[in-house]
Amino acid sequence: MAAGDFRLCDVVLDDTIGRSTPDVEHERAVAIFDLIEENRFEPLGHSGGPYRLNISLMDSKLVFAIKTEEGGDVATHILSLTPFRRIVKDYFMICESYYEAIRSATPSRIEAIDMGRRGIHNEGSQTLKDRLAGKIEVDFDTARRLFTLVCVLYWRG
């Protein structure tokens, strides 16, 4: 363990929930790949990683179980999903519109829907970053990728 190496080296989603649609699974795979490639993940009060993160749902709560690269327990944080419900619902609705639009809509229509999708995704990312404050310090890009994974879990669950 390198002191100050505040990054994720592995991310696992609760696989007991099952798989989703090919589009959602693609989003999951891309988010995990991008997250591992570049992230800032600092569990407060811990000297450094890299870290392994298991994200799951338990009793309608979001669970972040953090371990060291070697598997030692670091922390488990449980967050209420309530602040995310509206954002995730809106995000799913606009994603459905986006996936429909890319099949038949004009480029300007697709771009407009995509801008709305990114705006809602940014809102969810900031909400997640705020909810993790005081527990885990993350940058905005890391929060974006983590929010994508929260949506995947929500979609499956």
From Swiss-Prot:
Q: Which Pfam families match?
A: UPF0262 (PF06793)
- Output the superkingdom of the source species: Bacteria
- Check the record and name the InterPro entries matching this protein: UCP032146
Family per similarity comment: Belongs to the UPF0262 family.
NCBIfam families in the cross-refs: PRK02853.1
HAMAP family in the cross-refs: UPF0262 (MF_00678)
Put simply, this protein is called: UPF0262 protein RHE_CH00582
